[in-house]
Regions:
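Pyridoxal 5′-phosphate
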Residues: 2-414
Length: 414
């Protein structure tokens, strides 16, 4: 076995000593503390990666834990992987359930949010004519999945719209409420949209829908480990997320939460025996897969807890405000489509520049300056999504701001 010499854990220990119980918001600006966190990553610093929403680098000690298990598996897969490593998924289940605030028998380990959400989408029995409410800002893959079910089974999928940014939580709840009819069976809501980073009022929508006997599926792909919350704060019965985004777990990890009382009526995506009808592990019946990826979730969770959820989101908001408020202050042509006040957003934000095509600006940022961003071209709005993470340096954020101001002053055709 190779000997790994990751400095990630020692960096976290030094950072924790620096924090010493200090409040999260002032600590967000302590570059010595965050410098220790940044040293836990083996990130490519020849570029500036501001698209951590799709997938994020994992700390080196998490990666090394996964590699260690992959090597061990490869020595004798049928014994090492299936008999030794796979049973350790139960420890991962227990710790994830504790973090989310649910029973461990309600926590299924999946490969990503899409797998979790499609289990919900295809798993509930619906009849021709039954209605599902989504929004035009739901994740495209989920909209495609609902559309396939509509084409195949004759259910009706209704898409509602809300302004960007929305004026209030109550406005969003009312948009859902007004779309409900006697045929409505399901609402799918994103916890935080991948387009603008808007955090939606999940708890209020769940409460409203429950009074009417409507199931609510929550797509939490960008929420878990991005900002603190628990299952009971949402009140939801179903929740799907990826863990390779904000938890910084290995690529190809996620979870699906299904309340115990709902498990019997939600079919798994792949077949499971009738004896597993009320066993959350039926959602993990996916055939042969590496144990290394999901076992390393535990190391990522330990890293997340060492930072702390409040500290993390305070830092992410600080980085967001650093570039967004600067651009707003220095150019009247900049518009930020994400709320910057209160707790309606975390580290994700969307902006555009009047007179500059967002797709061209995104391409220019990469081609000329090696800055990775995400173009958002939606039927109702467009812009560039900026998504830093805890390994992002202040210098990288400032260089991004400098570059956008250069584009505003000189254009993107030079």
């Amino acid at each position: 076995m190779p000997v790994f010499r990751s400095n990630a854990l020692s960096s976290v220990l030094r950072a924790e000593h620096m924090a010493a119980g200090r409040p999260a918001v002032p600590l967000a600006e302590d570059e010595a503390y965050w410098g220790e966190i940044q040293r836990a990553f083996d990130a490519d610093r020849t570029l500036i990666n501001l698209n951590n929403g799709g997938v994020s680098p994992t700390p080196t000690h998490v990666l090394e834990a996964m590699i260690r298990d992959l090597r061990f598996s490869n020595e004798a897969p049928v014994e090492h992987m299936w008999s030794v490593l796979e049973p350790r998924i139960e420890s991962v289940r227990r710790e994830l359930a504790k973090e989310f605030g649910c029973d461990l028998e309600e926590m299924a380990i999946t490969r990503n949010a899409s797998e979790s959400n499609e289990t919900m989408i295809f798993g509930l029995d619906l009849k021709r004519g039954d209605e599902v409410i989504v929004t035009t800002q739901n994740y495209p893959r989920m909209l495609t999945s609902w559309d396939q079910r509509a084409r195949r089974e004759g259910i009706v999928v209704k898409q509602i719209k809300f302004t960007v940014p929305p004026p209030s939580d109550d406005y969003i709840v009312n948009q859902f409420r007004e779309a409900i009819t006697p045929r409505t069976r399901v609402i799918e809501i994103t916890h935080i949209t991948n387009l603008t980073g808007q955090i939606l009022p999940v708890a209020k929508v769940v409460a409203m829908a429950r009074e009417k006997g409507i199931e609510v599926f929550v797509d939490g792909a960008h929420a878990f480990a991005h900002f603190p919350f628990t299952r009971d704060e949402l009140g939801c019965d179903y929740y799907g997320t990826s863990l390779h985004k904000w938890l910084l777990a290995p690529i190809g990890t996620g979870f699906l939460y299904v309340r115990r009382s709902k498990q019997k009526s939600l079919w798994p995506l792949m077949a499971a025996p009738a004896s597993m009808d009320e066993n959350v592990r039926k959602y993990e019946e996916i055939g042969t897969h590496p144990a290394a990826n999901h076992n390393a979730i535990s190391a990522a969770l330990t890293f997340h807890r060492a930072i702390g959820g409040e500290r993390k989101v305070a830092r992410l908001r600080y980085l967001r405000d650093r570039w967004a408020k600067r651009l707003l202050a220095e150019s009247s042509r900049v518009r930020v489509l994400t709320p910057l006040d209160g707790k309606q957003a975390g580290g994700i934000a969307l902006f555009n520049v009047h007179g500059i095509d967002s797709a061209k600006l995104q391409g220019w940022l990469w081609a000329k300056h090696r800055i990775i961003t995400t173009p958002i071209i939606h039927a109702e709005f467009s812009g560039i999504r900026i998504t830093p993470n805890v390994y992002t340096t202040l210098d990288e954020v400032d260089r991004f701001g400098d570059t956008v101001l250069e584009a505003i002053a000189r254009g993107v055709n030079v």
